[in-house]
Amino acid sequence: MGPPPVAWRRVLLPTAVVAVLLTVCSNGYGFDRDELYFAMLRPAWGYVDQPPLTPLLAHGLASLYDGGPWLLRVPATLCAAGCVVVTALVARELGGSAKAQAWTAWGMATTTAALVFGHVLLTSSVDLVAWGLVCLCVLRAELREQPRWWLVAGAVAGVATYNKLLVLVLLAGIAVGLALVGPRRRLLSPWVWGAAGLTVLVGLPNVVYQLTHDLPQLRMGRALSENNAGDVRPFMWVFLVIALGPPLVVIWLAGLRALWRDERVRFLVVVVAVVVLFTFVSGAQPHYPMFVLPVAFAAGVVAMERHLGRVWGVLFAVNGAVSAVIALPLVPVGSVGATPVPDVNLLAQDSIGWPAYVDQIGAAYDGLPDHAHAVVVTSNYGEAGALARMRPDVRVFSAQNALFDQARPPDGTTTVVLVGGQLPEARGLFTCRVVARLDNGVDVDNEEQGQPVAVCRDPRLPWPQLWDRLHHLD
């Protein structure tokens, strides 16, 4: 017997609510630093820190419109809406009735993950729906006994590598799960091996780029681990609770139990364990398990369907309200610094103050007597992206990540307006004088707040050597 019918009307209502809410709030506090960075990157087959898909989307959309971030965020909104639908379809594959599908869709619509990564265009926005699609296809292959769905899963995973190579961790988790808890015969299936081959074939340009550029993703991963591991390893356990919201933890834990009790899909529990272990060992970012938790949540809703009533409806509503306040620009920008929101949601923190910062940096640049041999060099890509977006008349460079390779100041440059935390290094390379301190004016303590703006002259090394000294990955 096949799965229950798709309850499209009951699933699409919460999907539409999420899409409308995200669209209404899309301009919000302004661009996130990563959005500004992606928009500044010129199209390429890959970058030291990213595959090409999300930067290509951001650059293309940003070039169509020079106003706020709403257009840039349309793909993120679509990904969040897609995540709601896909998670409901996962519940259906697991035997969920129309009621279970509706509860799953409404539940996913209330999560911090869907609202945070649906509000800002990041690689995580795409991964949230891409990982769900891979898992949905694998479930269809196993539960419907239609192995051709393995090929679809492989194709989706191959496309997902253009967004982030992290999807390979999901595939590794599936392989480990099949090997450890079965069904082991799948490891001998030509459909599974065909899926693996299709992933490699579709993602081949990514492989070629990595091999011909000295495996930059490994270098980037090591840099992130060195910089972040001390914070990521303790915080990832907190993130497991807040990713979908504290009220939903009970449901996704019940989902893991339900998946474990079904021999056909028990391997998915191992997938979750592998992703959690990878997150801990790599220490790069805390949010990676978020991409597989929706599957466990859907399984939990199906398992707990008869217990879901008015009390759980209230809990879902509370979860949605708290998630919205955390994830979306509902608190006025002038007041948000006095709330916990910037501390809980770093994306909100990283979206506040860019116009003020650009004005302050621009004032230092405009005050220079000679612009012909002057540039702005920023310590991070957010500052560079903001200037490129809001002051296109200023020549701006950064030696962080992919911007290091994209361009460096001309050899004849004699004066630099240097912005941010690299001033100590710059003092050994130039004669520098601090002329301002960045201030967003709303008391939000983000990465830029209080950072110096310095005028640096008389470079002591040729620019190729200076640029190498300023280069950093993080």
Residue ranges and their predicted role:
Residues 312-373, 382-385, 389-393, 399-401, ...:
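Membrane-proximal, lumen/periplasm-facing interface regions of secretory-pathway glyco-
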Residues 170-261:
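Transmembrane-lumen/periplasm boundary regions of multi-pass, lipid-linked membrane glycan transferases
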Residues 8-10, 87-110:
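Transmembrane-helix signature of polytopic, membrane-embedded enzymes
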Residues 134-149, 254-261:
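Membrane-interface transmembrane helices that cradle and orient dolichyl/undecaprenyl
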Residues 15, 104-109, 157, 161, ...:
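Short helix- or helix-capping micro-motifs
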Residues 119-126:
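Short acidic/glycine- and proline-prone juxtamembrane loop motifs at membrane-interface regions
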Residues 74-95, 133:
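Transmembrane-helix motifs of polytopic, lipid-linked glycan transferases
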Residues 23-38, 47-61, 66-70, 214:
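Extracytoplasmic catalytic/substrate-binding loops of multi-pass membrane glycan-assembly enzymes
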